Amino acid sequence: MPRNHKEGLALDEKNGNTKYRDAEKLEMYQHAEYSTFKSLGKGSPGPDGDKKIRVHFVYDVKHASCHKVRLVAGGHLTDVPVDSVYSGVVLLRNLCICVFLAELNNLQLHAADVGNAYLEAETKEKVYIIGGPGFGKLEGHTLIIHKALFGLRSSGLRWHERFANTLLTWVLYLPRRILTSGCEGTAIYGSILPRTSTTLQLL
């Protein structure tokens, strides 16, 4: 597995393909779509008070030989933010409990995956980088990081806030019948619905 841009290109050349190069381009295209960076120009100094950090590509091969590259920030170079950096993760045990309760009460389960989830949230950390190899036209540019890039200390928290606020918006503005479809008159309707808004505020 390559450890950096140079090794990725060398491995592509050895294998006679461009899989890692293409994965890098796709990753950078997605950052352009999300407006992750704001360029101050090539060779420009960083903003006063902002911390200069490093970023690097992380390489992986997923199922069906799908090559994936993720741009990760060196968050260890920054000070610990004042606000909490904790963000919970789903435990298999908790997932099993949810499936059990759904089956017990004849409820439908729905699942979704948010691609590039962290990039949906904006970071509050004042950090910038210098675009390196693999950044294309932005190589050598001073780039302010606007989005919750993987590796930043508070990115998990920022995404958690973004997701919770989105769910709360749905609860407040979606028609009530959509939220309670199939549950009217049941114990689930009577016990869960009144607590929905309060629960989401705690997320």
Q: What do these predicted regions represent?
A:
Residues 1-165, 169-176:
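Chromodomain-type histone methyl-lysine reader module
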Residues 162-203:
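Active-site palm subdomain of RNA-directed nucleic acid polymerases
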